[in-house]
């Protein structure tokens, strides 16, 4: 393996999945044509993987995270040559197994694009088809970025693949910061640091400069010196970075903060809770939430998690306990004062809630209940097909299947 310094300078590597039922000779032809398109000026390097069926393609995107694009060709078949139990479970859970089994072969490609969108929505798909434009135009193609009609234009496909990956690889704020660090800027708001000059000229702390390197000081910036953007009123690279973060995490909007998770938690609690509101809170939640409740003037009803004695740790708050407290407050005539339910998903020990079920059963008791899910330990879930449906943001984005009201839950 290359050392970190060499890897940082090397071109990023990814893999492209080609789905087509071809023989060994045709597979070599596909791979060689893809390899032949490489150019020295390309920002990335990729290799092609070829699988014959829809089921094989689903297994590949579920378990191979090097795959960043998928090319669906008209020759794909439905079933794998191997028994893929995990795919059968996925299709059953997605509610489409019987429908797919009865599907015409010409619809396998569009259906694969739709299924991949459920497990790896960040991928780009490219559909190669022999069907007419009129037939394709009205179909739901999921993550399909472009359709190629009756052609083998590998260069055009190659350029589209690179363009799609480049769009997801953009780092607007980091790029702006690196450009800013190269400018001959004078700093007057923090004189002791002065872009590292006081360190490089010191007789005593040269080791500090050697440890951190010059870039961390050259990238010194603040709202007073300008040159980048404003966290309070973003309009440039920070705004663009926040928009890309929203797309990555599936949120409506994203805000960056430099105060850490604790201050963010207190800010959210104070924005949602009014003095005198009753709030149901996981007793084991992060301490910043407790501070936020004090600052907001909330009346807290603590919820206890269940013990896991065999592992010497605690689990999550049982749904039965949450419903018991809501019904108890309802019997006391205080349900109208209940404002918010605060839970940690996943817990500090890795236990995950069934968020959709919690939403469904709590909203049946109090339809205007606000849910605050602390998922600081679960940010990775969006990027893993196994956990993708477990974060609160996924449940909020798909309420129509399980929730008793047409109004999406407030999260």
Regions found by a protein language model. Give the residues of each.
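Conserved N-terminal alpha-helix of the aminotransferase class I/II PLP-enzyme fold
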Residues: 1, 207-263
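Extended low-complexity, intrinsically disordered and solenoidal helical-scaffold regions
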Residues: 1-5, 25-26
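Beta-sandwich/jelly-roll carbohydrate-recognition scaffolds of carbohydrate-active enzymes
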Residues: 10, 22, 240-242
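Conserved PLP-enzyme active-site core in the AAT-like
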Residues: 15-21, 28-64, 72-75, 79-122, ...
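Ligand/cofactor-recognition surfaces for anionic moieties
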Residues: 67
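N-terminal capping/interface segment
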Residues: 96-138, 207-220, 224-227
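Terpene synthase/cyclase
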Residues: 133-212, 217, 223
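Conserved active-site and cofactor/substrate-binding residues in soluble primary-metabolism enzymes
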Residues: 168, 172, 232, 236, ...
């Amino acid at each position: 393996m290359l050392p970190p310094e060499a890897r940082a300078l090397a071109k990023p590597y990814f893999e492209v999945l080609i789905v087509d039922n071809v023989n060994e000779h045709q597979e070599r032809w596909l791979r060689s044509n893809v390899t032949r398109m490489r150019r020295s000026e390309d920002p990335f390097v990729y290799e092609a993987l070829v699988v014959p069926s829809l089921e094989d393609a689903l297994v590949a995107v579920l378990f191979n995270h090097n795959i960043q694009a998928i090319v669906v060709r008209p020759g794909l078949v439905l079933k794998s040559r191997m028994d893929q139990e995990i795919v059968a479970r996925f299709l059953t859970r997605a509610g489409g197994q019987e429908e797919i089994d009865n599907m015409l072969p010409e619809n396998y490609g569009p259906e694969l694009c739709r299924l991949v969108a459920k497990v790896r929505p960040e991928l780009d798909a490219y559909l190669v088809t022999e069907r007419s434009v009129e037939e394709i135009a009205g179909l739901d193609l999921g993550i399909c970025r472009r359709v190629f009609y009756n052609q083998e234009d590998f260069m055009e496909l190659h350029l589209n693949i690179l363009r799609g990956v480049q769009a997801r690889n953009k780092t607007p704020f980091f790029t702006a910061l690196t450009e800013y660090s190269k400018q001959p800027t004078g700093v007057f708001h923090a004189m002791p640091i002065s872009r590292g000059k006081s360190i490089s000229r010191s007789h005593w702390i040269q080791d500090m400069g050697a440890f951190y390197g010059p870039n961390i000081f050259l990238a010194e910036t603040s709202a007073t010196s300008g040159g980048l953007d404003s966290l309070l009123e973003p309009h440039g690279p920070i705004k663009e970075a926040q928009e890309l973060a929203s797309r990555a995490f599936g949120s409506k909007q994203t805000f960056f903060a430099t105060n850490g998770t604790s201050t963010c938690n207190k800010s959210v609690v104070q924005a949602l809770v009014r003095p005198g509101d009753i709030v149901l809170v996981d007793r084991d939640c992060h301490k910043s939430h407790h501070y936020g409740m004090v600052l907001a003037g909330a009346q807290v009803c603590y919820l206890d998690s269940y013990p896991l004695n065999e592992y010497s740790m605690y689990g999550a708050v049982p749904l039965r306990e949450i419903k018991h407290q809501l019904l108890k407050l309802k019997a006391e005539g205080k349900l109208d004062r209940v404002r918010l339910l605060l839970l940690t998903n996943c817990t500090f020990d890795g236990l995950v809630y069934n968020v959709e079920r919690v939403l469904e059963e709590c909203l049946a008791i109090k339809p205007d209940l606000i849910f605050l899910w602390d998922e600081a330990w679960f940010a990775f879930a969006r990027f893993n097909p196994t956990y993708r449906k477990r974060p609160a943001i996924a449940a909020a984005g798909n309420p129509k299947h399980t929730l008793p009201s047409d109004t999406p839950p407030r999260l």
